Each structure stands twice: as C-alpha cells, then as structure tokens.
C-alpha cells in the first residue's frame, strides 16, 4: 500500500511525535509512505531518517490559536491551490490512502480525495473548539466519507455527528523508558515540574503562582519548567516574559525544549499538568506513568479519561493556583499514597498505553480506512 501523509506543521509537537511513533510500524508492514509538510522543522529530518520521502507543501500563513475572519478569507482564496497540490501529490505517489495528521489540510485533502477517488484517514489530535472549525472539518469528513481516528473522547465529540460509524478512539502511547528510574532518596532535593509546550493554555503561569504559595512551606526544592513555544505562536514571547516575572525569587529551572523527555522525568518527584484549556489527553501524563512519576493535574479536556483520580494520579478542582498548591502540599505529605499512585499509573500504562498497543491499533485503523476506498 502507498500512503500519502500530510501534516500542517514541521515542528515536533505531540501530534508529530505520535506520527513518528507510528511510522516504523507502517514501514514494517511493507507500506510505502510519502509525506508532505510545510517548512523545514525537525519533523522533516526525523522522517527522512526513517526512509520517508518528504515533500514541501504550503498550507497558508496561519498562526496557532483561534482563526480570524481574515484567516478564513485567506484560506478560501488559497483553497483551490492547496487542493490541486494535494491531488498532484496523491497522483504522483500513486497513493492508496491519504493520511491527514491535522485539521488545517483536511478540507483540501478531502476535496482531493473525492476528486481522485481515494480513501482518506483523518487523525484528530485535539478538540476543534471553534464552531466554524468543527463544522468545516465535519463537512470535509462527510464530503470524502473519511475514516477518523481521535486521540480521546473529548477530541472526538465535535466530530461524532459527522463521522458516525467511521470514527474510532485510539489513545496515544508512551515508549518504554530507556532505563528504569532510580529511586529518589529521602535526602534528594525535591523536584516538581511541568513538561510541555510553553503556552497560556498549558498552565505554566498557574504552576508558578502555585509555586510561590508553596515555596515557604516546602523543604528545599526546585520547580522545573521544561518546554518551549512551538508552531509560530504569536504570543509566545509575551507569555515567556510573564513566566520569568512570576519566577523571580523562586527556585525555578527553565530547561527549554528537550527532544528526549526521559532524563527530565526521571529527575522529578512529581509531574504537574496544570492545563487550563487542554484540547486532548496530553501524552506527557502517559510518559510519566511509564517512568513511574506521580501526576497532579487539572481535570481539563481529555485528562480525566487517562487519570483515575486518587488512584493513578490526583486531579485538582477548582483549576486555580491556590487549589493546585494545596493539592501538591497534600500529596507530598503522603509519600506512601504518592508511591502507590506512581505504581498504579505504571500498571495502567502497561495495560492501555504502550507503544505496541498504539501501533497495533493504528495499523488496523489504517488498513480499515484503506479498505473503505
């Protein structure tokens, strides 16, 4: 089978990491994969290192976040060119399936699939919160009769009425850590951290406000923020400046972006996921489970689908810095409960969120989507 794979970014966000997780399994089946992405970010050399031919594609000068009326007009003006380009790529690669890894290219890909008679699989990695965006994606799914995979029920909900029986839920996965995490001794400096893209919806500011409330009462500790802005986020520099202001006088380490998350997680006593507008079920929680790191999180988006409160992790309500500080203090005071949650999270990862399970389910979904053609 020949697969044409389309992504709207070439940075390495969660959706792109999922793609890299899947590619070896597709190639092991003997399927030929050709990809097209905009730009020349780290996704491009990563895919080429796996033997994937990568073409460049334009999908418009749109920035991360909510789209404006002018964005919609630019999209409409560029649509014929986008769609024709995808159709040419599909014909040139003799594609048996068009795999769309994000919503921005979905309308053009759906039109190209319909025109060329090819099946299409849309992988939905985050909830389309804007009504216009979910309507446009839904109409595209209907136009092409597309198969859809969503990473959680929360992400799937706006599309369910359009996709119907053509929708599957396949949760993300975490790889096996390269080595077992060494126990953190009682004399080790306490480390509490956030890992992920730097953005207001990810809650680093809430974490730092909670840290300021916590710092006077905790034993010596470090607060860790690992990550950076991605996807040409227009507000990134302003938000980064706010974070440094909030961190002033606190024992905070800003680690920047790390390609490998395991060395960071292995040094944490507690992972905090303070997302205030989480669009899916963040994969860093699954990575923490794999690494036996306990988790405290706001119950945002699809997070409650992967965290069993009080068993595999601890959910915080209301989603405020004060409540977060109180929850962190509470769980740190109960080390036995914390260790129990870390073990239960690891067991849940083994049962539901391994890379092998993800690849198996996704390969089956790709085969299912291709048979629909």
Task: Show where each model-derived region lies.
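A conserved mid-protein helix/loop that constitutes part of the nucleotide-sugar donor-binding site
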Residues: 13-21, 199-213, 286, 322
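Short His-centered aromatic/hydrophobic patch
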Residues: 100-106, 124
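Carbohydrate-associated surface elements
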Residues: 154, 173
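Nucleotide-activated donor-binding/catalytic signature segment of Leloir-type glycosyltransferases, i.e.
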Residues: 237-257
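Acidic donor-binding loop of glycosyltransferase active sites
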Residues: 266-280, 293-294
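Short hydrophobic beta-strand element within catalytic cores of glycosyltransferases
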Residues: 294-297, 307
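Conserved acidic donor-binding segment of nucleotide-sugar-dependent glycosyltransferases
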Residues: 309-310, 314-321, 330-336
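A short, well-ordered alpha-helix in the C-terminal region of glycosyltransferases
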Residues: 323, 330, 337-352, 358
